[in-house]
Amino acid sequence: MAKKNTSSGQVRIISGQWRSRKLPIHDLEGLRPTTDRVRETLFNWLANDIRGARVLDCYAGSGALGLEALSRYANFATMIELQKNAANQLKQNLATLQCQNAEVVNADSLQMLAKGTATGFDIVFIDPPFHKDLAGKTVELLMTHQWLNNDALIYVETESTLASFQVPATWIALKEKQAGQVCYRLYQYQADIAAKSATE
């Protein structure tokens, strides 16, 4: 979620099966739908990996990232959103698109991640509200409770003023860019790094 868009109250899907579709978003304070420019860059990065992937959007908000992934033929998406009104709008948008390979979970992301999962994910979006120290905690829970498949790709979007952002040694930095007040990065989780270290 980059800048808050208060004028249109819509999110536009850039490409894929729902290309150029505009969907309503619930106007909440602090909601920052990721801009078209940033999303286009991100999904260029993911172009060879998105089709058939299991996707987890930890802070869904407007659904801009999860819906874009589904439009580009991700196999399944789980979208976590704390605010009930925003979660309900996401469910309505999925119904409008007649999308049946997604779920919206109205829950606190950190609490849900702490419960663990029976099935890992291939692509994870971490785009939390800014200035709340959530990105680092989210990373820790993803690792502790085994949410990531090996070679999973993890997208992290934070405020550019964040002093530091630490990731596990098993996360390889692939891409990093800045757009205005937003810094966004792509990592890949490589479990074999941990296994190799353990045997040395």
Region annotations inferred by a language model:
Residues 1-200:
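Class I S-adenosyl-L-methionine-dependent methyltransferase catalytic core
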